[in-house]
């Protein structure tokens, strides 16, 4: 009874709970069943009375009353008449809220095609009827008749007839011998006539019978849509509307403005046009108007309904009175301002304030300063409640007055309310989850929020006028989550790479660095002190200085855990830092007996976190910050102009390089090198010179100068700032005191003349002009790429949002193999750091002894990682999200460590979103950082390799001895490795044509150069000696003399011979002949003929004698472009979108021998003949057609292995997947993407990239459907396919054959299982059209779709609730089953047996 009473006064029902959402086509019956009445008039409201017109668009009889519990005429008012329908005005007495829910409808006088299914490509109606879209449009818009029933006439089904044809046919065959119709009725009847089952059956037969690819594709597309209609229970004719639904009036409001005008939603205009035309059409039909008029009206009706659904999709856009296009139903949904992104995903939060931030150095790490005024406003409801509870005020009104007057007791209560009630601080843009953190508020005077200095790095905040928003978590659960998960003290490590993010910066670093400096000859050197107090007394007395080398007693913990005091060598400054270190066996004074740079302090915090846990780290960080600020202030470090040192040798180096550049100019003038080569060499020389000047400058800055008493002078202040990492970089110092160096043009090319001056000397006018390019380009790039980076993040989040940890362990034995990242002899990323925080997939054994280092399924922590490093293991197979076999989401063991916590990941962690944020966040950071070095070009070219270990050289692969006795590498797969104690420590694959400085079996020292090559050209080298013969080198066709204007020197360059008809069948080549005029034989049995590609520069002429290892021709490579993230962000996007690169590499599909076949038009034919396989069968050879003029990296007769490049370039990721498989693809993508970030010095953990790649590899393509009933060429999710496959195998059918497909992130997002998520991402119309035809069900598994329907997301706390719901549902099923079992009567079975 109570519930009933409550219902009367509070009619808000709990929203119905649901587990999934289905979208399908609405039948006319369905639309009528939703509707509360037909709308017959286009009127809206009476402009005098403001009452809705009857039967109009706002009719109260259909949609409900405008005021709560009051009919329109006012006969029935108040609650007691609830549910009565007024006999005068026909309005039901109920809540006005029903006007938001009740729909109406319009009965159309003539059917109308739904524009989404007609025009949204691929057109569903056209596919159902198997007709071109153009023809269907002609019929719909009354241009042509369509034959629906040919009868016995020679006309064909679906044939189009113009007006004249139709007349003629009627005369010829008689009126009744055939039927042809026109307009939407015709299309509707054709759709009605389709028998889905028969049609599908027929298509399947045709599919199995056809061989041509085109037809197969066409049939399978059509079959798919037929099956979709069959399975979803939709009828094709529903794509043509006979009834149009009208949405509730409150959702398309009409608002009176002052001055008797109205503001209205565009939908009302659109509906009005539909109703007007519909009514006119009805009247014309009743009046039996001429056909042509009716037809015109029908066409106009079709157009008006089109505009209502999707304005501008067909024909011209319908505009309103103010010439602005009207916003149709489709526009309401799509785009950034549409329903999905603006209102469902972009909800705003209440209880928030925002203000400027200032620094709060005396705060603790978990605190923030909140202005009193702001706190009072934010915590108002809490204050009212507390005032009431304490009996200080009787009513809310009274409380309100007290708070407004700011009476003294209010402040006391505010203190109580705020105590331990965390607030969230957010700084836009929130690029990763550390952009919102929780703090305990501390009331302060003033109007600015105080922020702790150490969290600035996470927020990317600075105090130059940044603003931050404050949000108050209201419910107890929210407060709990804020405290446990979001408190700044819980976010010490960065989720992107697991390194501390709460790291001192700027002043603090400078203070600590200054403290940790030790200097010779300081007062008090060599004294011994008992403790810190004694040192401080001595410093106050001036007996000892901060940097003196002294001895002192220091307490440390032994490995047994006992505190021990011992005398150590230190300085007073270092003692101060040592006093802050927590006691732990692993943490001793040795960690700080060095100059503490920013990096060292970061490592220190990391070590404290690993060994002593979170609490100790927070306390330590706070203390360190205090000390750093204090000491930086005391040190008073400053610098003047004279602190910028210009190196003595600068002029000498510049002159030397000038001479070198002139020499190159001369060589170019003499025709020894090309213009491009000269450019490359000059740029390179100047880049090297700039670096040398910078090194000289740094060396002079570091030199220790002593005064006459032997005391060291103060270190240079600028050097201190840069070296400690407090501010500035070596690149900036180089520009202050060295030389600015090379500049880039806006196009990205490097200007040949460098800027020789530095900022201290001042730039000349010309230099200044040159340097403005870089600066301007930097600023322009920043603006553009911020947007690009944001869009990349959005796509990444969208593709990865449903990747959640769902279980502890999926139990797979698969994994990926990780190796150290080595480049040019330097280990960039060690194996230990790559495998850290993962689970091993199989046993790791010592390569030398074969003994077990780590068993399988072990979590690799720091200690185990060190053990793996120590055992010199080359590679480790670890679990990875790429190989995880969890059905939805991924499992904890495959993911490994939660980087932000340093422990194995928890169930319910949204690892996909974290991955997307970690990759996207630096994108914005980096783009904003392009201009810091002022556009100074850095040429990143590597042209040699050195040994990084001492050992023996082993050269494997073809080489030849050149004229100077050096080995020249003759193949793409020659490898040079260094062995230590017989174990391979490092391996290099130098490029073709590199010259080795060592021979096989030589002993090398560490750092010794093993070989080098010219980075600017690729040579073509002869393997044998003999006489040169030029072939097909026809002057003016395939070769041209390039005479340089500047020098008048000619050189012979191979021209592009395909441009003219005469040269189409030339094959320019250089042959090496023996005495008798035949070709020399090469070691692999081929002829010594070297094909030349366009652009090659000849080094020898016809008839010259050559020796082995001599260069016949050079192919210039592109000039060095600046490697900025400018190349980086688009590169990352290109990789994630899996686009085919422009000039992509051609990859060998199998092992085999290369042959050059007969040429085809202007393509070269390359054939790979594989070896005979184990059964003695000869597999089929593979042919490639390659455009002439491309440089082919293999030679006739070479043996190549699968996956090798036949043509150099960027490989196509799809090829890698097809030829080498998933693991190779993952390695390629991870390495390429990491390279971009590494170049910028941004550390990101590999597993984030792997997570995104997993999402790109979710689909498989059906190659052979077998007996699964799937369609060839279909793309399916792996779990779905597995289900179908199991069914087929269980039936005893043939299994299907599939291959994995790689989808770019945009495509993968649009093809996700959830149509809600896809629709809110991009191409809303297309997604919804497809989903409704297929009758798709969204099971609400990802985060996005749950946010949109307003439920808890299935991650974090929500994932636990989700699992509880699952358990509950299972239990309910079991209980129901038990009940049924209990109810079953027994006698039925007995009766059965009698009957038998």
Swiss-Prot record:
Residues engaged in binding Mg(2+): 462, 464, 466
UniProt KW keywords: DNA-directed RNA polymerase, Magnesium, Metal-binding, Nucleotidyltransferase, Transcription, Transferase, Zinc
CDD domains the record matches: RNAP_beta'_C (cd02655), RNAP_beta'_N (cd01609)
Region (Disordered): 1372-1396
Family affiliation: Belongs to the RNA polymerase beta' chain family.
Presence of the UniProt keyword Nucleotidyltransferase in the record: yes
Pfam family of the protein (one): RNA_pol_Rpb1_3
GO MF annotations in UniProt: DNA binding; DNA-directed RNA polymerase activity; magnesium ion binding; zinc ion binding
A GO cellular-component term linked to this record: DNA-directed RNA polymerase complex
GO biological process, one term: DNA-templated transcription
Binding, Zn(2+) 2: 810, 884, 891, 894
Full protein name: DNA-directed RNA polymerase subunit beta'
Cofactor: Mg(2+); Zn(2+)
Chain residues that bind Zn(2+) 1: 71, 73, 86, 89
Subunit structure of this chain's protein: The RNAP catalytic core consists of 2 alpha, 1 beta, 1 beta' and 1 omega subunit. When a sigma factor is associated with the core the holoenzyme is formed, which can initiate transcription.
Keyword RNA-binding: no
Gene that produces this protein: rpoC
E.C. designation(s): 2.7.7.6
Enzymatic reactions: RNA(n) + a ribonucleoside 5'-triphosphate = RNA(n+1) + diphosphate
Lineage: Bacteria, Pseudomonadati, Pseudomonadota, Alphaproteobacteria, Caulobacterales
Listed Basic and acidic residues bias regions: 1372-1382
Described purpose of this protein according to its UniProt entry: DNA-dependent RNA polymerase catalyzes the transcription of DNA into RNA using the four ribonucleoside triphosphates as substrates.
């Amino acid at each position: 009874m109570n519930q009933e009473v409550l219902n009367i006064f509070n009619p808000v029902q709990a929203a119905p709970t649901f587990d999934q959402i289905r979208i399908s086509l609405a039948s006319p019956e369905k639309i009528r069943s939703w509707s509360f009445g037909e709308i017959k008039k286009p009127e809206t409201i009476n402009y005098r009375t403001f009452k809705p017109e009857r039967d109009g668009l706002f009719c109260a009889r259909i949609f409900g009353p405008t005021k709560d519990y009051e009919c329109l005429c006012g006969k029935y008012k108040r609650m007691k008449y609830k549910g009565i329908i007024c006999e005068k005005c026909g309005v039901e007495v109920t809540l006005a809220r029903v006007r938001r829910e009740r729909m109406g409808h319009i009965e159309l006088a003539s059917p109308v095609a739904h524009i989404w299914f007609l025009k949204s490509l691929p057109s569903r109606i056209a596919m159902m009827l198997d007709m071109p879209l153009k023809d269907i449009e002609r019929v719909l818009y009354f241009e042509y008749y369509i034959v629906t029933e040919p009868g016995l006439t020679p006309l064909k089904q679906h044939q189009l007839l113009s007006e004249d044809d139709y007349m003629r046919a009627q005369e010829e065959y008689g009126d009744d011998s055939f039927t042809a119709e026109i307009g939407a009725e015709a299309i509707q009847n054709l759709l009605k006539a389709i028998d889905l089952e028969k049609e599908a059956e027929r298509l399947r037969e045709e599919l199995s019978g056809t061989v041509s690819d085109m037809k197969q594709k066409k049939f399978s597309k059509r079959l798919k849509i037929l099956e979709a209609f069959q399975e979803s229970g939709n009828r094709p004719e529903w794509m043509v509307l006979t009834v149009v639904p009208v949405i509730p009036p409150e959702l398309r409001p009409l608002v009176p403005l002052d001055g008797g005008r109205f503001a209205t939603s565009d939908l009302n205009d659109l509906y009005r046009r539909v109703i007007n035309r519909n009514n006119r059409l009805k009247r014309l039909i009743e009046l039996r108007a001429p056909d042509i008029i009716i037809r015109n009206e029908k066409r106009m009706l079709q157009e008006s309904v089109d505009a209502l659904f999707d304005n501008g999709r067909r024909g011209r856009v319908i505009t309103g009175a103010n010439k602005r296009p009207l916003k149709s139903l489709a526009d309401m949904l799509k785009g950034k301002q549409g329903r999905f992104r603006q209102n469902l995903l972009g909800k705003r939060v209440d209880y928030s304030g925002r203000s400027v931030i200032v620094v709060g150095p005396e705060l603790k790490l978990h605190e923030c300063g909140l202005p009193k005024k702001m706190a009072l406003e934010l915590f108002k409801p809490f204050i009212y409640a507390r005032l009431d509870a304490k009996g200080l005020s009787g009513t809310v009104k009274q409380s309100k007055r007290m708070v407004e007057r700011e009476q003294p007791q209010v402040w006391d209560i505010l203190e109580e309310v705020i105590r331990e009630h965390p607030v969230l601080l957010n700084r836009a843009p929130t690029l990763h989850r550390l952009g919102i953190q929780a703090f305990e508020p501390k009331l302060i005077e003033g109007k600015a929020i105080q922020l702790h200095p150490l969290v600035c790095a996470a927020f990317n905040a600075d105090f130059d006028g940044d603003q931050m928003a404050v949000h108050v978590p209201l419910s107890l659960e929210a407060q709990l989550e804020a405290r446990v998960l979001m408190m700044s003290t819980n976010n010490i490590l960065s989720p992107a790479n697991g390194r501390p993010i709460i790291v001192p910066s700027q002043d603090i670093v400078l203070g600590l660095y200054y403290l940790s400096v030790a200097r010779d000859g300081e007062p008090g050197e060599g004294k011994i002190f008992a403790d810190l107090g004694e040192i401080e007394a001595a410093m106050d007395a001036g007996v000892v200085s901060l940097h003196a080398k002294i001895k002192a007693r220091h307490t440390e913990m032994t490995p047994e855990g006992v505190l021990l005091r011992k005398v150590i060598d230190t300085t007073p400054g270092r003692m101060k830092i040592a006093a802050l270190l927590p006691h732990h066996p692993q943490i001793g004074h040795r960690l700080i007996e060095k100059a503490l740079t920013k990096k060292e302090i970061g490592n220190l915090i990391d070590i404290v976190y690993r060994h002593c846990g979170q609490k100790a780290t927070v306390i330590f960080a706070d203390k360190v910050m205090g000390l750093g600020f204090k000491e930086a202030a005391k040190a008073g470090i400053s610098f003047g102009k004279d602190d910028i040192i210009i190196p003595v040798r600068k002029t000498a180096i510049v002159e030397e390089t000038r001479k070198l550049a002139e020499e190159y100019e001369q060589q170019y003038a003499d025709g020894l090198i090309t213009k491009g080569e000269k450019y490359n060499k000059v740029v390179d020389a100047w880049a090297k010179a700039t670096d040398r000047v910078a090194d000289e400058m740094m060396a002079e800055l570091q030199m220790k100068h002593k005064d006459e008493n032997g005391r060291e002078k103060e270190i240079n202040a600028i050097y201190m700032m840069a070296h400690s990492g407090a501010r500035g970089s070596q690149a900036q110092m180089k520009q202050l005191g060295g030389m600015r160096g090379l500049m880039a043009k806006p196009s990205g090319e490097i200007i040949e003349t460098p800027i020789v001056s530095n900022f201290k000397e001042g730039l000349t006018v010309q230099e200044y002009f040159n340097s403005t390019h870089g600066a301007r380009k930097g600023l322009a790039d920043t603006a553009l790429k911020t947007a690009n980076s944001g869009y990349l993040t959005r796509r990444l989040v969208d593709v990865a949002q449903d990747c959640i940890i769902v279980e502890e362990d999926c139990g797979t034995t698969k994994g990926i193999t990780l190796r150290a990242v080595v480049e040019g002899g330097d280990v960039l990323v060690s194996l230990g750091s790559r495998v850290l925080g993962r689970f091993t997939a199989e046993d790791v054994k010592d390569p030398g002894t074969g003994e077990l280092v780590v068993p399988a399924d072990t979590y690799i922590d720091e200690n185990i990682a060190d053990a793996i490093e120590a055992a010199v293991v080359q590679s480790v197979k670890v679990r990875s999200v790429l190989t995880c076999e969890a059905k939805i989401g991924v499992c904890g063991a495959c993911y490994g460590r939660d980087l932000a916590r340093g422990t194995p990941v928890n169930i319910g962690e949204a690892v996909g979103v974290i991955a997307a944020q970690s990759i996207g966040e630096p994108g914005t950071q980096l783009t904003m950082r392009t201009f810091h070095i002022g556009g100074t070009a850095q040429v990143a070219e590597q042209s040699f390799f050195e040994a990084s270990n001492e050992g023996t050289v082993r050269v494997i692969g073809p080489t030849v001895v050149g004229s100077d006795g050096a080995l020249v590498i003759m193949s793409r797969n020659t490898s040079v490795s260094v062995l230590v104690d017989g174990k391979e420590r490092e391996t290099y694959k130098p490029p073709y044509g590199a010259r080795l400085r060592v021979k096989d079996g030589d002993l090398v020292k560490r750092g010794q150069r093993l070989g080098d090559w010219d980075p600017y050209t690729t040579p073509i080298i002869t393997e044998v000696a003999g006489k040169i013969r030029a072939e097909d080198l026809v002057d003016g066709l395939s070769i041209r003399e390039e005479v340089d204007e500047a020098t008048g020197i000619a050189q012979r360059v191979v021209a592009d011979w395909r441009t003219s008809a005469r040269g189409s069948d030339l094959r320019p080549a250089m042959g090496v002949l023996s005495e008798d005029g035949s070709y020399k034989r090469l070691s692999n049995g081929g002829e010594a003929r070297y094909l030349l590609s366009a652009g090659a520069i000849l080094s020898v002429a016809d008839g010259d004698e050559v020796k082995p290892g001599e260069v016949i021709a050079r192919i210039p490579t592109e000039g060095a472009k600046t490697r900025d993230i400018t190349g980086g962000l688009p590169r990352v996007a290109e990789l994630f979108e899996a686009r085919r690169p422009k000039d992509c590499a051609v990859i060998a599909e199998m092992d085999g021998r290369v042959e050059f076949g007969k040429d085809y038009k202007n393509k070269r034919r390359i054939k790979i003949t594989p070896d005979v396989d184990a059964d003695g069968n000869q597999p089929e050879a593979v042919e490639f057609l390659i455009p002439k003029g491309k440089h082919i990296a293999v030679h006739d007769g070479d043996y190549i292995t699968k996956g090798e490049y036949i043509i150099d370039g960027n490989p196509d990721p799809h090829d890698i997947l097809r030829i080498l498989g998933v693991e190779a693809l993952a390695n390629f993508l991870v390495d390429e993407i990491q390279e971009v970030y590494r170049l910028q010095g941004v550390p990101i953990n590999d597993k984030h990239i792997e997570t995104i790649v997993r999402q790109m590899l979710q689909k498989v393509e059906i190659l052979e459907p077998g007996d699964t009933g799937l369609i060839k060429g279909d793309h399916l999710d792996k779990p779905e396919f597995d289900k179908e496959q199991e069914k087929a195998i269980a039936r005893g059918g043939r299994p299907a054959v599939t291959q994995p497909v790689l989808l770019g992130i945009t495509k993968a997002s649009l093809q996700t299982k959830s149509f809600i998520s896809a629709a809110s991402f991009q191409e809303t119309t297309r997604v919804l059209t497809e989903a409704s035809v297929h009758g798709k069900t969204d099971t609400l598994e990802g985060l996005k779709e749950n946010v949109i329907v307003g439920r808890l997301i299935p991650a974090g706390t929500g994932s636990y609730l989700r699992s509880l719901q699952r358990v509950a549902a299972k239990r309910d099923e079991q209980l129901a089953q038990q009940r049924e079992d209990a109810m079953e009567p027994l006698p039925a079975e007995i009766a059965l047996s009698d009957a038998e």
